[in-house]
């Protein structure tokens, strides 16, 4: 005679196994989605660049989150001493607060890009909100004299469906990067220096943050002569992008 308790036990074990499988698949999917959303080198669609394929030893040096009245001028001085031009992806609200610093970046011959107005994660925002973040910053940059194409870099490198859709509609390039020393972890300059020099390749886009403090400045002072000694030249993002086939 069939034991109903044993049958029930087997059924529950089957349910438990299927439930565990669902949890595992959901967990893997969530991790994959998070990696996709926050990837600094990949975007689902649209025109984007994280590195340019080239045999020439050229790199683009980029700075996010400025302008900052204390640290951005120090970064500019370090770049001036090496005669190097970079690209600064600025937050609109910081341009609004410190327009003179933004103009100084431009006066010294550097490129300026758009890093949104308020630095939100644009992943789950409506298309209208995303467009407002971009267009509001565009206007502020035009007001200080920026001309030509204004490239865009997603805050937190976060993007999924909505942001690429908006950028496609606006015919805008999304600038990511393949060299990230993870400044947010508060590493010391020697650690970040080693990380950058290990990751860099011809056509790389290096990501730093000009509002960060002394460790970022020391890292910059380390990598510029080191990369120059290795035969690298520095270009703006626009110059590097023109090398794409």
What are these regions (language model features)?
Residues 25, 66, 91-93, 117, ...:
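Active-site beta-loop-alpha junctions enriched in small/polar residues
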Residues 37-129, 133-140, 148-149, 214, ...:
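Active-site beta->alpha N-cap acidic-glycine motif
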Residues 1-62, 73, 77-87, 198-245:
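Terminal accessory/targeting
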Residues 158-199, 232-243:
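His/Asp/Glu-enriched short active-site or ligand-binding loop at hydrolase and phosphoryl-transfer sites
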Residues 73-74, 100, 125, 162-165, ...:
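Generic recognition of short, well-ordered alpha-helical segments
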Residues 123-146, 163-175, 193-196:
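Soluble catalytic domains of enzymes that build or remodel membrane lipids, polysaccharides, and related
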Residues 151-154, 244:
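Cyclic nucleotide signaling catalytic output domains
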Residues 60, 113-116, 175-181, 204-209:
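Short beta-strands and strand-loop turn motifs
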């Amino acid at each position: 005679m069939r034991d109903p308790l044993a049958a029930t036990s087997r059924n529950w074990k089957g349910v438990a196994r299927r439930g565990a499988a669902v949890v595992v698949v959901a967990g893997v999917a969530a991790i994959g989605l998070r990696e996709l959303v926050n990837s600094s080198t990949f975007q689902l669609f649209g025109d984007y660049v994280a590195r340019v394929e080239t045999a020439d030893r050229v790199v683009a040096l980029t700075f996010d989150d400025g302008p900052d009245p204390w640290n951005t001028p120090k970064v500019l001085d370090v770049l001036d001493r090496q005669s190097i031009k970079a690209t600064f992806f600025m937050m609109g609200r910081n341009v609004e607060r410190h327009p003179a610093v933004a103009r100084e970046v431009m006066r010294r011959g550097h490129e300026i890009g758009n890093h949104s107005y308020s630095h939100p994660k644009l992943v789950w925002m409506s298309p209208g909100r995303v467009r407002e973040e971009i267009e509001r910053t565009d206007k502020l940059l035009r007001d200080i004299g920026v001309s030509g194409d204004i490239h865009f870099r997603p805050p937190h490198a976060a993007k999924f469906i909505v942001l690429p859709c908006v950028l496609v509609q606006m015919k805008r390039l999304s600038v990511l990067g393949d060299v990230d020393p993870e400044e947010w972890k508060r590493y010391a300059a020697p650690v970040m220096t080693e990380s950058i020099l290990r990751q860099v390749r011809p056509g790389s886009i290096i990501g730093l943050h000009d509002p960060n403090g002394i460790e970022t400045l020391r890292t910059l002072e380390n990598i510029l002569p080191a990369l120059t000694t290795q035969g690298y030249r520095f270009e703006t993002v626009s110059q590097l992008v023109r090398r794409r086939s």
